[in-house]
Amino acid sequence: MVLLIHPPVVKPCEPPAGIARIAGYLRGRCHIPCALLDANLAGLEHLLGRDRPAADTWTGRALRSRAAHLRTLRDPLTPRHFDRYRRAVYDLNRLLVLSDPSGGQVPNLVNFRHRERSPLRSADLIRMAERPEENLFHDSLQGIVDEAFDRHRPSHAGISLNYLSQALCAFALIGMVKKRHPGVPVVLGGGLVTSWMRRPGWENPFAGLV
């Protein structure tokens, strides 16, 4: 059994095609069972569900309208009403940005920024794996990941990393899996990883992690 994980943060407006395609290949060609975990959607939903003080009018309105905004984004007819869509995105992004009171980690519906860590530096990615509990999504995802491991008992975990906006959280997820499920090898793949490996003279700086 292989557990395929789609990490935060990318647009949650469509299913994670990367792990779906891998799952189809593993099941159809290799006859290997696999399970899929959309940690991106789960993590964003958990952050949006948190209670927080309404420090200003905008935040208060966003909190009151949170459930309605989520229904709006899930409604296939919403693109016909751009003003509703825009208001929902602005308000939900407001709540996500306030998820970290210190302002050190800044998520929204399409991106994740860290004021002290860069997805372009391998040393910072390694630090995220070494200290997964410092990642903003750690508390959101720990229970979900543990439940998936308990249910499926995977022999391997695969993490699909396609965009820079996923990199820091993906390595925090790698660190979480290594600490909580140390007997399960982690395989890292995806478009971003492929681009790294195509660089002339590339050497894997993540040996021991993946």
Q: What kind of feature is each model-predicted range?
A:
Residues 1-3:
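Extreme N-terminal starter segment of soluble prokaryotic enzymes
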Residues 8-52, 99, 110-210:
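Glycine-rich beta-alpha loop elements in corrinoid/cobalamin-binding modules
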Residues 36-108:
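Non-catalytic, alpha-helical, charged scaffold/linker segments
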